[in-house]
């Protein structure tokens, strides 16, 4: 039996808007694109989606912007896949003296970056040509647009001795710990198909589980993987899990069909009608609170070895 508490996207959007506003008020944050109408009276859905994604990480990490033990003050930072710049804006506010490079070939920022933030539209898959080294390289939710092992090697070369690289990324497939997500559930089938299609594109969506290994191979030390769960919907009993599930469901559904159709039809060769019928079934299961599914979310960080005799912070301090 499907337990679906939201009749339509408007009901879901209203529930998310109320929940987000309460969270922002409690955490003292500005709305920055969340559920705000543009001058023509419409909402900017993509800006809204990225802003909500930032709040998902904010809640997941208990308000932290990173887990790496950075020096204070941090002097130079490179953010890869900046997107709407919400993370960069927040980091710059907390670290006003830091020089920050915000890298994204297709930025969507509508937030003033400030004088200390330098926009950079170069392709991070190409050789990096930065003229300075960084104390911290950060990358969040690049959605498999990057060659990750290559990224780790270039980050290693671009970091100062003792500097940190941190990746924050959702992984696939959706999984469950209590048997409510069967192998033949459309949601499980969808996850397997996403992995199949992404591997054909040489951008596997299950790569984040390998990040720590690749970091170590690139030369990083003091590497750590911290795993979190983003529920598929508000099925958890605890308040934090329920909130994460509510926001995550809305965030996923904003681009669910666009993203999935592209992989099923263009990569795997499905007929459009078959893809849409199948995805309708997947959507039902995404919203089914009787299915206790979640996406693994990984925060993986590692340090370039410090110079001998330096006073650089390590994770053991």
Curated annotation (Swiss-Prot):
Consequence of gene disruption: Impairs the production of terrequinone A.
Key word RNA-binding present: no
Induction: Expressed during both sexual and asexual development. Expression is positively regulated by the secondary metabolism regulator laeA.
The organism's place on the tree of life at top rank: Eukaryota
Keywords: Methyltransferase, S-adenosyl-L-methionine, Transferase
Signal peptide: none
Group of enzyme by EC: transferase
E.C. designation(s): 2.1.1.-
Biochemical pathway: Secondary metabolite biosynthesis
GO terms of molecular function: catalytic activity; methyltransferase activity
UniProt keyword tRNA-binding present: no
A Gene Ontology biological process term: sterigmatocystin biosynthetic process
PANTHER family, alphabetized: METHYLTRANSFERASE, S-ADENOSYL-L-METHIONINE-DEPENDENT METHYLTRANSFERASE
Family membership noted in the UniProt record: Belongs to the methyltransferase superfamily. LaeA methyltransferase family.
Function: Probable methyltransferase; part of the gene cluster that mediates the biosynthesis of terrequinone A, an antitumor agent. The first step in the biosynthetic pathway for terrequinone A is formation of indole pyruvic acid (IPA) from L-tryptophan by the aminotransferase tdiD. The nonribosomal peptide synthase tdiA then immediately converts unstable IPA to didemethylasterriquinone D (DDAQ D), via condensation of 2 IPA molecules. The symmetric connectivity of the 2 IPA molecules is thought to arise by head-to-tail dual Claisen condensations facilitated by the TE domain.
Protein's name in the database: Probable methyltransferase tdiE
């Amino acid at each position: 039996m499907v337990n679906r508490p939201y009749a339509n996207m408007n009901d879901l959007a209203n529930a998310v808007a109320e929940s987000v506003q309460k969270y922002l008020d409690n955490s003292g944050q500005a709305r920055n694109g969340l559920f705000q109408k543009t001058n023509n009276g419409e909402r900017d859905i993509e800006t809204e989606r990225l802003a909500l994604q930032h709040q998902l990480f904010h809640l997941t990490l208990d308000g932290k912007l990173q887990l790496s033990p950075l020096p204070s003050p941090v002097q130079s930072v490179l953010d890869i896949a900046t997107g709407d710049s919400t993370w960069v804006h927040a980091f710059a506010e907390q670290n006003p003296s830091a020089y920050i490079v915000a890298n994204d070939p297709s930025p969507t920022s509508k937030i003033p970056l400030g004088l200390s933030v330098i926009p950079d539209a170069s392709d991070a898959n190409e050789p990096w040509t930065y003229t300075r080294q960084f104390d911290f390289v950060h990358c969040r939710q690049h959605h498999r647009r990057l060659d990750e092992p290559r990224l780790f090697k270039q980050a290693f070369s671009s970091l100062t001795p003792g500097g940190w690289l941190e990746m924050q990324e959702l992984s696939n497939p959706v999984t469950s710990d209590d048997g409510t997500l069967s192998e033949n559930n459309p949601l499980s089938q969808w996850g397997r198909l996403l992995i199949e299609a992404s591997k054909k594109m040489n951008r596997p969506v299950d790569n984040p589980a390998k990040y720590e290994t690749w970091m170590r191979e690139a030369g990083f030390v003091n590497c750590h993987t911290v795993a979190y769960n983003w529920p598929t919907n508000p099925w958890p009993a605890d308040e934090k899990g329920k909130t994460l599930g509510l926001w995550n469901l809305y965030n996923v559904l904003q681009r669910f069909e666009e993203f999935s159709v592209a992989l099923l039809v263009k990569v795997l060769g499905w007929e459009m009608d078959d893809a849409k019928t199948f995805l309708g079934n997947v959507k039902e299961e995404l919203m089914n609170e009787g299915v206790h599914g979640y996406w693994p979310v990984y925060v993986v960080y590692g340090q370039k070895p410090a110079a001998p005799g330096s006073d650089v912070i390590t994770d053991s301090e």
